[in-house]
């Protein structure tokens, strides 16, 4: 597997964990350190594994359904660091409902940063910014 393939696999695992709302799978994707950060759309930046994990737990508890269609994906690898830039096209429900008539769509542009930890790529930054319908 090439480095680019490894980063793509780690990035795919991140979105699979997010769609499944699986905190254990999400924990497997991330480096557990104080240097990591996450910025969810509309949230302040959170640093450190405890705050990052807490944010995913809150999102998972308050989301009934979420699906991502990723577009304009570009993977860049430089040594033991890599980043993925992409657009997230999101279909989700408000609250815990999974009813089709409760779904809404949105879009965010994202940067996911990974570092190589021995043979694995681990996420250290996820930053997602909302994109307006006009943008």
Roles of regions detected by a PLM:
Residues 1-25, 31, 35-135:
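A beta-strand edge to alpha-helix "cap/lid" segment located at domain peripheries
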